[in-house]
UniProtKB/Swiss-Prot annotation:
Record's protein name: Outer membrane lipoprotein PM1514
Topology of the protein relative to the lipid bilayer: Lipid-anchor
Primary location class: membrane
Listed GO CC annotations: cell outer membrane; cell surface
Length: 331
């Protein structure tokens, strides 16, 4: 009878046991390896997907490159932030002069003398082709000295400014500016010597004035429109009108009622020149504007010789400049 020698058979048994375990556990091991394959394959789709965002980012950069030069710095957006003159050149303001400017969005202080009027010099971009290209390369500040009575301008074919010097005490007009280096609009201004203004006894004023209302519309903010203005005062109250310069087509009625130094412009034309916006023409129209008037003494010491004021809304804005005309009785 042979006995099972466990000591001699133990190595063989263990070897068989290990083999059996390896074979039986192979399914688990293969499953584990099968689950790991997707992990090894992940980089392929990731790399493929990553290529697309990279291309999209480059496209966005290309699209955003043109506006880069128009990023509003303190100097570029200064006027529209109402701080251009004050931030860049506060020392050019005059404590002896008073004035205002009006644009499509703002009414600002404009206390510059006739010897240093704040304007902009716009330089166009000759290479602008696409709508995303900036139309302007730069807009530098220029201070203008008004030496000639009447209109002063730098370029008749495309002026950066047109300023009308009535006399040594008063001027009005406009200069061009741009907020985004693409769109240009006219900024309407006036200025006068503080000690030349009269605010007394205007309730007794009887006089006739003629001049112009210089304005732009939201449709074409860079195109100046000149309207002929007439305003006749009698005992502090006044009526008048503004006509289109070339056709005498009435654009506005002017009323001065309770306050002699405040005028109401009420549109009577459904469409203003250069505009495709419909105006509400009824009395007390929501499209009317209020203009504070300033009565200025002439250089010849004639009281209330000139009137200036500015006003506007989202459809139109401009400046009013008038001069007293002698009546037959005064002659």
């Amino acid at each position: 009878m042979q006995y099972f020698d466990i000591k001699k058979s133990l190595p063989v048994f263990c070897s068989l046991l290990i083999t059996a375990c390896s074979g039986g556990g192979g399914g688990g091991s293969n499953n584990s390896n099968h689950q790991a394959h997707p992990v090894n394959q992940v980089p392929a789709p990731v790399l493929h997907v990553a290529a697309k965002p990279q291309q999209h980012v480059e496209q966005e950069v290309i699209e955003k490159k043109p506006p880069v030069p128009v990023t509003r710095t303190a100097s570029q957006s200064s006027f529209y932030s109402a701080k251009a003159p004050s931030q860049v050149s506060h020392d050019k303001r005059s404590v002896h002069w008073k004035g205002e400017s009006v644009s499509e969005k703002e009414h600002l202080d404009f206390s510059y003398s006739k010897d240093a009027v704040f304007t902009r010099h716009l330089v166009t971009n000759p290479n602008a082709v696409y709508s995303t290209d900036p139309n302007l390369i730069s807009k530098d500040i220029k201070y203008i000295t008004l030496t000639t009575t009447g209109y002063n301008q730098d370029n008749k074919s495309g002026p950066n400014y047109e300023l009308n010097l009535l006399d040594e005490n008063i001027y009005y007009g406009y200069y061009r500016d741009s907020q985004d280096m693409n769109h240009v609009e006219n900024i309407y201004v006036y200025g006068f010597k503080k000690d030349a203004e009269n605010q007394d006894n205007l309730q007794f004023l009887t006089a006739n004035y003629q001049g112009e209302f210089l304005f732009s519309t939201a449709t074409n903010p860079n195109v100046p429109v000149l309207g002929k203005a007439v305003l006749n005062y009698k005992e502090g109250k006044a009526k008048g009108e503004i006509l289109e310069r070339d056709s005498n087509y009435k654009l506005f009625d002017i009323y001065v009622n309770e306050r002699p130094n405040q005028a109401i412009l009420n549109p009577v034309a459904e469409r203003l020149p250069t505009s495709d916006l419909i105006m509400n023409t009824r009395k007390n129209s929501p499209d009317r504007v209020t203009i504070d008037l300033h009565f200025i003494k002439g250089q010849d010491n004639q009281e209330n010789k000139y009137i200036v004021g500015q006003g506007g809304n989202e459809k139109y804005w401009g400046v009013l400049g008038l001069e007293k005309k002698e009546t037959k009785a005064e002659k």
